[in-house]
Amino acid sequence: MKTEALFETTAKPVEMKRSDWLLGVIGILKPRETSLLVFIGFCSAVVAGGGHPEVGNLGLALVAITLGSAGANGLTNYLDRRVDGRMQRTIRRALPSGLVKPPEKVLPLILALLIAGLALAWLLHPLAFVAGLVGTIAAVIARKTWATHILGGVSGAAPVAVGWLAIDHSPGLPLLLLALLIMVWVPIHVWSLMMAYREDYLKAGVNMFPVTRPVSQSIKVFPVLSAALYGLSIGLWQAAGFGWFYFALANVLGLAVFLASLRLLKTGVNRDAWRVYKLSAYPYLGLIFLAMCIDLWL
């Protein structure tokens, strides 16, 4: 009887701490990625305001971008949960690991964030709402088409558009170039990650470029995209009227990404794909948007 009682006691599953569950929910919203999107949205608003945007609209725009970006990131996490569960890199995420279950539990929160973000965007300006809505739709349908990462670029450009249109209601060439910068940046960033974990993606059954092509072919796209990214950043210097500070940093960052892409083209190894991925994240995107603001404040 004692042995049986002991067995019953030790066999009970350990209850999940509420704090672990809460951290899991926060993780689904991808706070690091969301913070980067909010930051570039903030910088876009600063540029639209000539360095000094109206504080009330800026604050409302930041709340809208935060809510919308968190909701969109949560939605992509939810839609990708099955693929994430088949990959070593992502299997420990909250949804595939079962930390938050059933997965549908997070949908009300995700939808509430998206609706709240879009509602605030509408209060700012109808064009800001349209930008947020297009970004949300692109995030949803991206998983169902070959143009996944092109639509991902559209979704990624939404915070920039919302931030700009919250301050300046007349979109022009600078906003177009900012959006194009993001749309070119997204495939560099995402595809380099996929190349770094190519075998993991293939084992998970991900049938899309670049992992479906031979490495020697797929890596050729990186110098081309990096050159386009570099060109867009310099075009933005002209269109937005930035000064020497932005010009200098845009050249340094653009060359860094381009040279890293050339190295990947030369070696074709996972390590160099990972370097392109890491360099293109906060070091490139964060710094080049920060340079725009500093240039206007100097």
Task: Please state what every model-predicted region is.
Residues 4-22, 78-100, 191-219:
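Cytosolic, membrane-interface loops and tails of multi-pass inner-membrane proteins
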Residues 39-42, 93-94, 151-168, 216, ...:
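Small-residue-rich segments of transmembrane alpha-helices in multi-pass membrane proteins
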Residues 39-81, 88-89, 114-117, 129-137, ...:
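Membrane-embedded alpha-helical segments that form the functional core of polytopic membrane enzymes
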Residues 66-75, 137-141, 179-198, 252-264:
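Transmembrane alpha-helical segments that form the membrane-embedded catalytic/substrate-channel core
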Residues 81, 85-127, 214-238:
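Multi-pass membrane catalytic core of lipid/isoprenoid biosynthesis enzymes
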Residues 99-169:
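Intramembrane alpha-helical segments
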Residues 161-174, 229-236, 284-298:
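Hydrophobic alpha-helical transmembrane segments in multi-pass integral membrane proteins
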Residues 258-288:
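Interfacial loop-to-transmembrane junctions
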